[in-house]
Amino acid sequence: MGKIRKLDDQLSNLIAAGEVVERPASVVKELVENSIDANSTSIEIHLEEAGLSKIRIIDNGDGIAEEDCIVAFERHATSKIKDENDLFRIRTLGFRGEALPSIASVSELELITSTGDAPGTHLIIKGGDIIKQEKTASRKGTDITVQNLFFNTPARLKYMKTIHTELGNITDIVYRIAMSHPEVSLKLFHNEKKLLHTSGNGDVRQVLASIYSIQVAKKLVPIEAESLDFTIKGYVTLPEVTRASRNYMSTIVNGRYVRNFVLMKAIQQGYHTLLPVGRYPIGFLSIEMDPMLVDVNVHPAKLEVRFSKEQELLKLIEETLQAAFKKIQLIPDAGVTTKKKEKDESVQEQFQFEHAKPKEPSMPDIVLPTGMDAKQEEPQAVKQPPQLWQPPKQEWQPPQSLIREEQSWQPSTKPIIEEPIQEEKSWDSNEEDFELEELEEEVREIKEIEMNGNDLPPLYPIGQMHGTYIFAQNDKGLYMIDQHAAQERINYEYFRDKVGRVAQEVQELLVPYRIDLSLTEFLRVEEQLEELKKVGLFLEQFGHQSFIVRSHPTWFPKGQETEIIDEMMEQVVKLKKVDIKKLREEAAIMMSCKASIKANQYLTNDQIFALLEELRTTTNPYTCPHGRPILVHHSTYELEKMFKRVM
């Protein structure tokens, strides 16, 4: 007898469940997507013990006909595709026909459904076996309950996280679905406590306000663009509103939430030099395209996709975001930095707390600013500030964060309900309706961000603090300018232009500069000699593992030539493949930082005026190349409120 045999359906479903049903969040995702495919306009999600004990999904969709109920729980049975051509033109969220049989094989499942024009169907399945099937009275739609998930696969239960973690995974996926389909009203409950309620009025900004807070919604920039193949719509936050994780960016393709690293990267590139290192925006981007241009049949979870015109799409996203930011004055209000964390900090990691300790600023050596002596000799910088009273220094102490003890999940021992599900109490209370109406009103009252160009407003200097910050004013209030960041931006745009030119003047070194490398480093640099010439670095081989540099571009900062050469060589060695665009960018950023005014350097009035005038000529006068803000605004109203002149 042969060794190879065909597996029975029950074992096949258990194996398939390993890919489709990883955790309770997978069950919620698949069932809610089925409800959306069934044209539901209202969906309720009820959880007990983060879904490990019970998941109940109630919708008002098309329902399932009696003759289809049994077939729906067979593998690869679906109403969404019929032939091979449909597989390449998928418009629905589900299509594989694996979710329902996989879920039923590892749980105790109860289904009540009706199409509205015939009696409903009541079905009970335990571990893939049909226990009960009968007709029942039911409204149009589907009511499906999944209990005791993984009851027959105890090994899977061992790998489940705590209730808090599993609930965080569920809320994350529900939030993404809510953003993907603002036309559907979603309600999420855990142990009878409401976690989310969206109105279903189609306003995605209202959904974002429900998830991330009304304060974040006020800082959203609308994004819209169209090409021959793609249509992009969405919202992204101003650069002043950032988070420490990429999880706050959501990408939707043809109504389906997807995880795609290159799309995330394109959004980040749209914020080029506007975000600090390690900070990410909150964003929602919906992309519509011909289904032929995207392959969603990559993984059973359907979270990964492939694009056939990927580079064209990425370019469109980058250019659209950059064009939007060029229309806005990106000056953060001082209030943004002093507010406590908004509720959205806990959206993706609901039960984890981010601890941050302030870093002390470094104080590099003092150098005079560049670019200020074009027409006249630079006045001597003031080395000592006026003798003013200074308050005693106090060390900042972060508040003690609340830490909850996580509890392990214990599976419920309740038997499956053999009777039809009773109608639960109505959650549409007057109080809940009022809260939703109040949110709708707040969102309607949000003023659109002005897109009148990003020119720096007129600023009139009035002083300097600690040799680091310049104070200026105009009719809109007080501005504080970081002098180092300001000149860093000026120098960056100057060097970026210079590094980008292949034909450039060079200056001979009096003594050739020798660079000794390890064999691995030498071979890597040798491969990139032509690329290095494009950024003005001309190397000659000198011995077995050395190079010499005889000249350098004239725009290298004086006295820092060898240091810059070493830095550029280090970048080449560090990168496995040299991206000439990135290399030029890094070189410009490095030189701009080294050539800029340092902290604790007091400037004369002439120097301050010259600095602000040069800043005005830059294409982006609002952030340094590292993404830190150059200036912060205190409105006149805020100042009056601080001094109780207004209440």
Swiss-Prot record:
Belongs to the DNA mismatch repair MutL/HexB family. It comes from Bacillus cereus (strain ATCC 14579 / DSM 31 / CCUG 7414 / JCM 2152 / NBRC 15305 / NCIMB 9373 / NCTC 2599 / NRRL B-3711). GO terms for molecular function: ATP binding; ATP hydrolysis activity; ATP-dependent DNA damage sensor activity; mismatched DNA binding. Residues 383-395 have a biased composition (Low complexity). It comes from the Bacteria. The keyword DNA repair applies. Pfam families: DNA_mis_repair (PF01119), HATPase_c_3 (PF13589), MutL_C (PF08676). SUPFAM superfamilies: ATPase domain of HSP90 chaperone/DNA topoisomerase II/histidine kinase, DNA mismatch repair protein MutL, Ribosomal protein S5 domain 2-like. One of its GO terms (biological process) is mismatch repair. This protein is involved in the repair of mismatches in DNA. It is required for dam-dependent methyl-directed DNA mismatch repair. May act as a 'molecular matchmaker', a protein that promotes the formation of a stable complex between two or more DNA-binding proteins in an ATP-dependent manner without itself being part of a final effector complex. Keywords: DNA damage, DNA repair. The keyword DNA repair applies. GO terms for cellular component: mismatch repair complex. Gene3D superfamilies: 3.30.230.10, Histidine kinase-like ATPase, C-terminal domain, MutL, C-terminal domain, dimerisation subdomain, MutL, C-terminal domain, regulatory subdomain. This is DNA mismatch repair protein MutL. PROSITE patterns: DNA_MISMATCH_REPAIR_1. Residues 375-395 are annotated as: Disordered.
